[in-house]
A protein has these predicted regions:
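N-terminal module-boundary/linker segments of secreted carbohydrate-active enzymes
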Residues: 23-105, 306-307, 348-349, 354-359
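Alpha-helical scaffolding within the catalytic cores
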Residues: 41, 68-77, 108-112, 170-172, ...
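Glycoside hydrolase catalytic-domain groove-lining segments
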Residues: 246-298, 333-351
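Substrate-binding cleft of secreted/luminal carbohydrate-active enzymes
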Residues: 56-62, 289-360
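Loop/turn elements at helix/coil->beta-strand transitions in domains of secreted/extracellular proteins
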Residues: 52-56, 83-86, 120-125, 179-185, ...
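Bacterial N-terminal signal peptides
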Residues: 8-17
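Substrate-binding cleft of extracellular glycoside hydrolase catalytic domains
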Residues: 97-228, 232
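Aromatic-lined carbohydrate-recognition surfaces of secreted/lumenal glycan-active proteins
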Residues: 60-61, 187-189, 219-247, 286-296, ...
Length: 360
């Protein structure tokens, strides 16, 4: 069911979306029913690498909803650089909690700040550190067998019902954002090629074809639930394997289910990140979907990261740096990262009337 866009900003964005030249090459979301604003953002994002400057959106993680989430990370970035991140992230799922009902691990109270952020010139990102449906709650880092995975995929089992209880509450939160006309960079089931989350592999760099198939089924199940069952048409779907593990594209659910591909990359040398060529070969817009230093001693020079993007990873459309000790604000080079000619910050996505120009 289509939702009315209630803010003049969104109306202007709609006007922008339908006023683009008919000869322009348009990149559309995988959801054919995507809202016009979401379509406009997708096309605009996909064309960022054609620009000569202002072509890589900055991003920061704001924390876990009803836990660590606040605007403090944005404020720290502003204090360090004079700029605010173009993208601000919240995680709806506190998968380590063990309440009586697994759905209570989900919270979306961060939506209020995300709506304000969008209306003032930024874009929200939602991630999910999901609790493990093989248990009554919690255990997001507890490994499960493939047979347990199969039970999670089966809607008739207690495990399947627990998954669907979480998905229902997540969809409620996403619905709030859609009602306000807010497009979302949605990054579920990330770092699946690692062995630390229940939805991923169980052994270090050991390929498991059955596990990969089960993951794809889970991803598609979530996509179908959000898009078809709940009719959410404001999501841009982000596929994000870990840069420090193999099998980065093996888990790829298919071009019909992914809008943006990226790498979650923790590094000491930004010139040595693995997987860029592999991910860009999927012919989707590319991003560094989660970044930070491997050594959390304040020594990472983020200036080298933006220089590496320009020299080695030029198709990058955005980055999202983790908060706390991984933040640019407590490492080196934050000002260079945010003030680099290639970087695009909050307020530079739309100019007050429409999205900034698409460059063919």
């Amino acid at each position: 069911m289509k939702k009315n866009i209630v803010c003049s900003i969104f109306a202007l964005l709609l006007a922008f979306a339908v006023s683009q030249p008919s000869y322009a090459h348009t990149v559309s979301p995988v959801n054919p029913n995507a809202q016009l604003t979401t379509k406009a953002v997708m096309n605009w994002l996909a064309h960022l690498p054609n620009r000569t400057e202002s072509r890589v959106m900055s991003g920061a993680f704001g924390g876990y909803s009803l836990d660590t989430f606040s605007m403090a990370e944005a404020d720290r970035i502003k204090q360090a650089t004079g700029q605010l991140p173009a993208i601000y992230g919240c995680d709806y799922a506190r998968g380590w909690l063990e309440p009586e009902e697994i759905a209570d691990t989900i919270d979306y109270s961060c939506n209020h700040d995300l709506i304000v952020y969008w209306k003032s010139g930024g874009i929200p990102q939602i991630s999910l550190h999901l609790a493990n449906p093989a248990f009554t709650s919690g255990h997001y880092k507890t490994q499960i067998s493939n047979s347990q995975y199969e039970r999670i995929l089966d809607s008739s089992t207690p495990e399947g019902k627990r998954l669907e209880a979480m998905l229902s509450k997540i969809a409620d939160g996403l619905q709030e954002l859609e009602n306000e006309g807010v497009p979302v960079l949605f990054r579920p089931l990330h770092e699946m090629n690692g062995e630390w989350f229940w939805w991923g592999l169980t052994q270090y760099n050991q390929k498991d074809s059955e596990r990969i198939s089960l993951y794809k089924q889970l991803y598609v199940k979530i996509y179908d639930y959000m898009t078809k069952t709940r009719g959410l048409d404001h999501l841009l779907w982000v596929y994000a394997p870990d840069a420090n593990r193999d099998f980065k594209t093996d888990f790829y659910p298919g071009a019909s289910y992914v809008d943006i591909v990226g790498l979650d990359a923790y590094f000491d040398d930004p010139y040595a990140i693995d997987g860029y060529e592999e991910l860009t070969s999927l012919n989707k817009p590319f991003a560094f979907t989660e970044v930070g230093p491997q050594k959390t001693n304040g020594g990472l020079d983020y200036a080298r990261f933006i220089h590496a993007i320009k020299e080695k990873y030029p198709k990058t459309t955005f980055f999202l740096a983790w908060n706390d000790e991984w933040s640019p604000a407590v490492n080196k080079g934050a000002d260079t990262l945010y003030l680099h000619p290639w970087t695009l910050n909050k307020g530079e996505i739309w100019d007050g009337d429409s999205l900034t120009p698409v460059v063919e």
